[in-house]
């Protein structure tokens, strides 16, 4: 079963329209769909359903779904960072995502997931088939461990806090660029020139020439 999960606000026209388009597309491909807005109804969905739409879910239910997943598909293009792949990898789930934006930084190709062109359907299909039918349990477990380790090492609160602290420390410890002797002399002459011009102007004004 393919489970589609996303933040959904019925007041936003684009959300409603996009859901309708996805449902219609799945139906046109001969797949049975269902939409569930509550946890009880989602749990009672029959196994004959091919695509399940969950417009909005709680964090606890999301984590429960991730724990039972084989692969997370992340389709946004040029996403600035994307927290969803991080959440999946933290749960030990490999991620297949668009090779643009944030996933380029968060996903390690072939180790914690895969990056493919969003418009290349065969490439995405190939990865899905690989995960579901070709990779052995040992290989999937290795990816799961690597995904968890990457999140802990690079994107955990501790890791990001240490990185931020290091950057701030480097900024505070950097010394101001020192002037060399020539620069100091030129600066002094410039200041003297300005001072002399001001003095002459004052004298001329005092004696009535200006």
Predicted feature residues:
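Short beta-strand segments
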Residues: 1-7
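Short glycine/serine-rich donor-binding loops of glycosyltransferases
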Residues: 82-85, 103
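A short, well-ordered alpha-helix in the C-terminal region of glycosyltransferases
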Residues: 139-154, 166
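Nucleotide-activated donor-binding/catalytic signature segment of Leloir-type glycosyltransferases, i.e.
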Residues: 6, 15-63
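Aromatic "clamp/platform" in nucleotide-sugar-dependent glycosyltransferases that forms part
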Residues: 77
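C-terminal alpha-helical cap of glycosyltransferases
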Residues: 24, 133-134, 153, 157-209
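Conserved donor-binding/catalytic loop of nucleotide-activated donor transferases
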Residues: 67-69, 87-94, 98-101, 109, ...
